[in-house]
Amino acid sequence: MYESIIPFPDETASTVDKYCCSHSTSLPPLFADHAAWTVDKFQTSYMMCCPLQAQMCVFLASDRRARRVLEIGTFTGYSALAWKEGMKAVGGEVWTCEAGPRAIAASKEAFAKYDPEGKIHLVEGPALQTLREINAGPFDIIYVDARKAEYIEYVEIILERHLLAENGIILADDTIHLGLVADRSSTNPHSAREDIEYSLQHADNVYKFNEWAVKHPQLDVLLLPIFNGVTLIKIKSQT
């Protein structure tokens, strides 16, 4: 279908999301339990990826036979658990970094409960510091979901330190940001949000990253209008 980006009203989008989840390989029960716990404990639970996105993470890690995943931004550990699930056949490991004290405490609790094998390694501290110091790579998948103003620096360090494995892939999350990177007019209902100034600041940072990434001579980039925008990045072939 040539006009392939189909907008749904909220009610239809919710129904379509449930349909997609039910027609994708299901997640183990621990994901529903941990999501419910996060919603109960955190007013900012919207920062957690949705079940369908977790299903995507599991699928990608499994399909690519990943053995090492680096996650920039842990929150309560939901997506880290998804990456681990996708690598269970090969015994892969996840390194996930987080700076927020509440998120660190929550993710520690989650990993103690759901990762008794110790396959998930929580790295505490700012993401930029972690990227400059981590020596566990190279990584088959690097998932970026932290401070939008630092996205460019994250990828620069990844390239500089050769943290991405050969044929590895970077996923940058939230790269459409409510559609505000492309449309800030009144036709976008999010342009009337109460927190519009905050949202526009995020959109500005994401816009700069998108422009930088697509023009980078070393990178192949695919920006997809799924979830809140997901950008797939790989290093260009040298042949």
From Swiss-Prot:
InterPro entries: Cation-dep_OMT (IPR050362), SAM-dependent_MTases_sf (IPR029063), SAM_O-MeTrfase (IPR002935). It holds the Pfam family Methyltransf_3. Its EC number is 2.1.1.-. One of its GO terms (molecular function) is S-adenosylmethionine-dependent methyltransferase activity. GO terms for biological process: methylation. S-adenosyl-L-methionine binds at residues 71, 73-74, 79, 98, 127. It catalyses: NK13650 B + S-adenosyl-L-methionine = NK13650 D + S-adenosyl-L-homocysteine + H(+). Keywords: Methyltransferase, S-adenosyl-L-methionine, Transferase. Pathway: Secondary metabolite biosynthesis. O-methyltransferase; part of the ank cluster that mediates the biosynthesis of NK13650 C, a highly modified cyclo-arginine-tyrosine dipeptide. Within the pathway, the cyclodipeptide synthase ankA acts as the scaffold-generating enzyme and is responsible for formation of the cyclo-Arg-Tyr diketopiperazine (cRY) from L-Arg and L-Tyr. The ankA product cRY is desaturated by the cytochrome P450 monooxygenase ankB to yield a dehydro-cyclodipeptide intermediate. PANTHER family: CAFFEOYL-COA O-METHYLTRANSFERASE 3-RELATED, O-METHYLTRANSFERASE-RELATED. Belongs to the class I-like SAM-binding methyltransferase superfamily. Cation-dependent O-methyltransferase family. This is O-methyltransferase ankF. The gene is ankF.
